[in-house]
């Protein structure tokens, strides 16, 4: 089977119960299947907490975090440091051999500046699969933070959904976006099983899909188009369903190309 990228989002990193459920599901899945897995993560909650402690402002534009030059070092420390190593620690606790990476390692994902108004925010594009394929062949679980670096050596904060999409394109991998929500909800709060670009545009126009979920849906649509196959948005809350999800059974919203 193709490698599978599991993008972790939401408050997952803040919840020991959620991490325990996730890594138990990963162990169970890896014992029963040979499919290579890769984790890609952001860590907005970790960054927000740190910003609060340092009395620094948090500003967003169209769901993307504005990252001034005087904040990129702090955000890099939170994402490539604290968030990444927290996940490695959980992997270690569960007996999974893992390697912590950022997007620039092995040039796995190419990054350029997205928009000068956003500051150190990067646009992710496919890079080289060589390093991660080597790690997968060795039986390792790569855990990749959404910090990248430009060819000019500038650190960039990349939206983790978009980073995961670029890495999936690099590796020819399938993609699951795991978050706090069970999928995309309609106006009545009911989960939508399948979503097309046309349906997504309607719900955005109607104000049903808003803010960060717009970024998530657009990232999933971009991924589905780039990869030529569906992308799943699902919740990490139902651990018992995760092995089935990792094996290709939809449990949230399946985004169609």
Swiss-Prot record:
GO terms for cellular component: cytoplasm. InterPro entries: AceGlu_kinase-like_sf, AcgluKinase_fam, ArgB, Asp/Glu/Uridylate_kinase, NAGK-NC. Its EC number is 2.7.2.8. Pathway: Amino-acid biosynthesis; L-arginine biosynthesis; N(2)-acetyl-L-ornithine from L-glutamate: step 2/4. It is an enzyme of class 2 (transferase). Transmembrane segments: none annotated. Substrate binds at residues 43-44, 65, 157. It is found in: Cytoplasm. SUPFAM superfamilies: Carbamate kinase-like. It holds the Pfam family AA_kinase. GO terms for biological process: arginine biosynthetic process via ornithine; L-arginine biosynthetic process. Keywords: Amino-acid biosynthesis, Arginine biosynthesis, ATP-binding, Cytoplasm, Kinase, Nucleotide-binding, Transferase. ATP binds at residues 180-185, 208-210. The record marks 7, 216 as: Transition state stabilizer. It catalyses: N-acetyl-L-glutamate + ATP = N-acetyl-L-glutamyl 5-phosphate + ADP. Gene3D superfamilies: Acetylglutamate kinase-like. GO terms for molecular function: acetylglutamate kinase activity; ATP binding. Belongs to the acetylglutamate kinase family. ArgB subfamily. Homodimer. Catalyzes the ATP-dependent phosphorylation of N-acetyl-L-glutamate. This is Acetylglutamate kinase.
């Amino acid at each position: 089977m193709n490698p599978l990228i599991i993008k972790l989002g939401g408050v997952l990193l803040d919840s020991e119960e959620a991490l325990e459920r996730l890594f138990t599901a990963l162990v169970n899945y890896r014992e029963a299947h040979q499919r290579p897995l890769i984790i890609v993560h952001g860590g907005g909650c970790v960054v927000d907490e740190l910003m609060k402690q340092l009395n620094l402002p948090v500003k967003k534009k169209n769901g993307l975090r504005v990252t001034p030059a005087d904040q990129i070092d702090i955000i890099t420390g939170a994402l490539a440091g604290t968030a990444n190593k927290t996940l490695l620690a959980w992997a270690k606790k569960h007996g999974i051999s893992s390697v912590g990476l950022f997007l620039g390692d092995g040039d796995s994902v190419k990054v350029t500046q997205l928009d000068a108004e956003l500051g150190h925010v990067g646009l992710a594009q496919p890079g080289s699969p060589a390093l991660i394929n080597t790690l997968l062949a060795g039986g390792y679980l790569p855990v990749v933070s959404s910090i990248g670096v430009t060819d000019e050596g500038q650190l960039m904060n990349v939206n983790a959904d978009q980073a995961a999409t670029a890495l999936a394109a690099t590796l020819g991998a399938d993609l699951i976006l795991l978050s706090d929500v069970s999928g995309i909800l309609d106006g009545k709060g009911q989960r939508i099983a399948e979503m097309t670009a046309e349906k997504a545009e309607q719900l955005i126009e109607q104000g049903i899909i808003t803010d960060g979920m717009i970024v998530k849906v657009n990232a999933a649509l971009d991924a589905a188009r780039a990869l030529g196959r569906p992308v799943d948005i699902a919740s990490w809350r139902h651990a018992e369903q995760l092995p089935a999800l990792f094996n290709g059974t939809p449990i949230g919203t399946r985004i169609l190309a």
